[in-house]
């Protein structure tokens, strides 16, 4: 499945919630009618079946993290093999992706921009270049901006925007050095309550 390259707001309207695909700290429901489905007239949302609700939740989470369908299914399989709660394991695996950690640290304004920074070899993990967005970041790993990339205006702008966002407790960032430490995996209570991972587990358990 190809990666979606169309308007980001359309995806958020389709899911009926802000997927945080746009930069900035202003909620997108102030920019568009997020409760209306995409289209000129914003078609009314029909009543979804149980399967439809589960599918929508899976699509929502997949789009938030910018993961393709096959990748997402593989993450679920890995989460199911791990000890503990499968849904919480799934979210931790997604949070541990390098592109997501770069976003959480504020080096990229969006996860898509953060993924691009990784792919363009602008990111170091423990002093070494890593250009794989899905690279699994471990506790106490140090993620930083490569020296020759530190003058990029988009990184500086992203750090300014990040100052206005709530800072994750599981990450420590030195904006001046453009360096951060992934202190630990986030607990489920650290993450958004707007995600219902139990619906995803129910979907894949069928």
Swiss-Prot record:
GO cellular component term of the entry, any: small ribosomal subunit
Record-stated family: Belongs to the universal ribosomal protein uS4 family.
UniProtKB keywords: Ribonucleoprotein, Ribosomal protein, RNA-binding, rRNA-binding
Sequence ranges assigned to domain S4 RNA-binding in this UniProt record: 96-158
Function: One of the primary rRNA binding proteins, it binds directly to 16S rRNA where it nucleates assembly of the body of the 30S subunit.
Domain of life: Bacteria
GO biological process, one term: ribosomal small subunit biogenesis
Protein name: Small ribosomal subunit protein uS4
Molecular function as annotated in GO: rRNA binding; structural constituent of ribosome
Keyword Membrane: no
Assembly and oligomerization: Part of the 30S ribosomal subunit. Contacts protein S5. The interaction surface between S4 and S5 is involved in control of translational fidelity.
PROSITE patterns per the UniProt record, alphabetical: RIBOSOMAL_S4 (PS00632), S4 (PS50889)
One Pfam short name: Ribosomal_S4
Listed HAMAP family: Ribosomal_uS4_B
């Amino acid at each position: 499945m190809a990666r979606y390259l169309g308007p980001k707001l359309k995806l958020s309207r389709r899911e009926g919630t802000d997927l945080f695909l746009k930069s900035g700290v202003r909620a997108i429901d102030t920019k568009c009618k997020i409760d209306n489905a995409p289209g000129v007239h914003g078609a009314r949302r029909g009543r979804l079946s149980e399967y439809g609700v589960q599918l929508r939740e899976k699509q929502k989470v997949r789009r938030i993290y910018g993961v393709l369908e096959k990748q997402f299914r593989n993450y679920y399989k890995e989460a199911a093999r791990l000890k503990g709660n499968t849904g919480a394991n799934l979210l931790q695996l997604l949070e541990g992706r390098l592109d997501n950690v770069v976003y959480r640290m504020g080096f990229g304004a969006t996860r898509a921009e953060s993924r691009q920074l990784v792919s363009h070899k602008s990111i170091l993990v423990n002093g070494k270049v890593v250009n794989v967005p899905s690279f699994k970041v471990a506790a106490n790993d140090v993620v930083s901006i490569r020296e020759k990339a530190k003058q990029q205006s988009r990184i500086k702008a992203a750090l300014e925007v990040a100052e206005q966002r709530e800072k994750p407790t599981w990450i420590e960032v030195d904006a001046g050095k453009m360096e951060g430490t992934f202190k630990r995996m986030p607990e489920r209570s650290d993450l958004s309550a707007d995600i219902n991972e139990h619906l995803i587990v129910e979907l894949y358990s069928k």
